[in-house]
Amino acid sequence: MNQINNMKNTLYSLFLLLLSILPAYASGDKPTIKSLLKELDRTIAMKADFHKQREHEIDSIRKLAHATPSPEEKYHLYSSLYGIYLHYQADSALHYLEKRKALLPSLQNPQYENDLWIARAEVLGIMGLYNEVAAQLEQVRRDQLDNQTLLYYYYTCRTYYGWIADYTRTDERHKYIEKTNAYRDSILSLTTNQLDHSVVLADKMIVEGQADKAIELIDKELAGLDNQESLVYLLYNLSQAYAQKGDTEKQIYYLAQTAIADLKTAKREYISLQKLALLMFEKGDIERAYKYLSCSMEDAVACNARLRSVEVTEFFPIVDKVYKLKIEKEKQISRTLLISVSFLSF
């Protein structure tokens, strides 16, 4: 009973954290870009605190897993640890995947075996091991999957082919885009949750060049939304829709909110902050661009998220060079002013 209560307390803490991520929407007050960027700066400065909170949650679940004699309970607790580590520290997610696998002989549940193949593909994708992702997905027995696991399989396939399409420069890119679109449609055909359906449908609309329709759909969902986790996905989709429309200010507005949410939930594998960094650079805010990219690189390396590391390194050297030139220029101005003041004092 104590173990169950402890688990409830841990989950309740996670729930409270999610509720605190984007309080502006909960209260109905919309923040300004200026206030959001200031909050993002504070959030980056407090990143270590959010990581400590995450480690505390991990430690609580790990203790429960160690204490329970039930293989079934251990399996589900290891699944929770896998989920927490997935976008935080991919190597550790893989470690708890192996612990789940070790329990399979005592559980005798073929559904779990398929679930592990999909989960392994998911984490290997984050680590950038795409050849291995394909090999894992080929092992899945789709005829054995219930609807929930089949949906998980579709999401993983859609993400995998999306990654491949983004980083393929050959004639095969179109083939991967078609596969990405096909799996997105499969998700839409199977999803029963209205909010999840809207998130995926908005993504589809944006891909098909229907930004205005996507914005209209998302705005309807935001009107009465109380699911903070889904809110993050909707806001990111809004940023993409406004990017398609060429509205940079709105893109910054929504990327800032998703970046804050990513950092407050101790995610290290993310895309919003580096996209925001590039926009800051284009607007001439070199200091923020440098800060955001440095944070993104640090987190990607700590998570072992190779794709995100590659994304950052594509334009970090340019930002780094401009930032250092800016600092040097400021030093030169300071030295000139100091000399001038010293001269006038005589």
Positions of PLM-derived features:
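A "functional boundary" signal
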Residues: 4, 12-14, 23-331
